[in-house]
Amino acid sequence: MKRQRVVVKIGSSSLTDPKGGLCHDKLFDHVEAIAYLKQLGHDVILITSGAVAAGFGPLGYPARPTTIAGKQAAAAVGQSLLMQAYSSAFAQFGFTAAQLLLTRSDFYSRERFRNLFATITTLLENGAVPIINENDSVSIEELTFGDNDMLSALVAGFLHADALILLTDINGLYDANPKTNPQAKKYAFLPEITDEMIEAAGGIGSAVGTGGMRSKLLAARKALSFGVSVFIGTGSGREKLADILAGKGDGTYIGVPFPKQMQMRKQWIAYHAPVAGMITVDSGAEEALLMRGKSLLPAGVTAVSGDFHAMDVVDVVNEKGITIGRGQVYYAAADLKKVKGRPSEEARQYSYLHRPEVIHRDNWVTLRKESVSK
């Protein structure tokens, strides 16, 4: 098997005991499987939950707290205990664990986005295991990833991972709830995630986590948009992850062979950069952007909204108000209003670097309906 870069996400339900606390036996089982993958020559990045589970007991809570303040306090205590457990377990196999705590704002800045990529790449080159969790102690609702499922998809995307493995306590996706319908049939393979599947999955997670099957499907669809194949399922023992990569996993494989991966710059534009404004284009420009792979020129712009600057990211909508894409502009809003609808040669004097394009094709991302929201 060729060397692969794999992102493994372990949720709270796969790390906890019946009372909701951290289960060290479960944690060691995951570590042993990751260590075995690394011994086979693969790069592995671990996305882990479990900080709240590790911290609520030592903090004096009888059960997992339900308030935001309680969860954040438990996470503040539990994150160091969680990393201590991982570091100790990986050391038994000769591997060094590295902690990275992220918030949504770490992805907004392109410079921080690049620095994160460089840091993780350097850790992998030196044989370490990057262990990533959301910084639950400081994250506020507006800045969170929603759950670590989505965080794992975003990390898998910008690292150009070959596979995203979402480990859970259910062995894959079914056409009905297997806990209530004994006739439910499991999907061994799915080429894509549809709106109907997400709707049917509901939104309720386990008592010890914030996710659920719906969040995993949303994360899987995001990963697929980056060109990353996905596995959702379960397993135990040293070879469970190796078996998943070999196509023998107990779960559902999602995606197509050899998907086209999205460039890191375009990932940042599409999913992470703050959107500073909106440009409306005519039908000719829409067709050029979507069907002919062209750049957006001033002549095709009919309206400009927002107070954006050159090199900001803006949404592009058609004449019906439907978002068709997102891109980095060479014109400030005030200048673009002056030159909209005019030929490029007349407009370029107002452009950053005197470019003829409003948005160059290299700085453009077409957005499908399901990819518009962050």
From Swiss-Prot:
Query: Which amino acid positions bind substrate, per UniProt?
Result: 49, 136, 148
Q: Start and end of every PUA domain?
A: 276-354
Compartments where found: Cytoplasm
Got a GO cellular component term for this one? cytosol
- Pfam families given for it? AA_kinase, PUA
Kinase is among the record's keywords: yes
Query: Where on the tree of life does the source sit, at the highest rank?
Result: Bacteria
Q: What is its EC number?
A: 2.7.2.11
- Kindly state which reaction or reactions the protein catalyses: L-glutamate + ATP = L-glutamyl 5-phosphate + ADP
Query: Which residues are listed for ATP binding in this entry?
Result: 9, 168-169, 210-216
Question: Where does it primarily localize?
Answer: cytoplasm
Q: Please give one Gene Ontology molecular function term for this protein.
A: glutamate 5-kinase activity
Q: TM segments?
A: none
Cite the entry's keywords alphabetically: Amino-acid biosynthesis, ATP-binding, Cytoplasm, Kinase, Nucleotide-binding, Proline biosynthesis, Transferase
The job of this chain, per UniProt, is described as:
Catalyzes the transfer of a phosphate group to glutamate to form L-glutamate 5-phosphate.
| Similarity remark | Belongs to the glutamate 5-kinase family.
Output this protein's name. Glutamate 5-kinase
**Provenance organism:** Geobacillus kaustophilus (strain HTA426)
* Gene that this sequence comes from: proB
